[in-house]
Amino acid sequence: MTLDSYAAAVADLDPDPGEVETAEILVTDDVLVKAFVLGPNAAVDPHEHADATNVFHVLEGEPTVVRDGEEAALTAPAVVPNERGAVHGARNETDDRAVLTASIAPLP
């Protein structure tokens, strides 16, 4: 038995260039934790959650994270809080995969 939910969730995710694959790590009535694996030149398009806070945890690679028009190229490990209503997204401009989780709470 392992307490780690991350390794098993992303083990089989291997997106092609330009593609994003996802896995739900935790889903409860209150919170969603979802893994995003970005292939080279892939993106999670900017979007917002009006009623929820979304926290990105960069776990692998070097994605560029966008929040409210500001962007930063990050290297794992990194954490980016996205408050309610913040327009946020991520893209991978490298030749390797990038992995981040998004923790969203409260759920609508």
Mark where each language-model region is.
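A short, N-terminal "cap"/entry segment at the start of jelly-roll beta-barrel domains
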Residues: 1-34
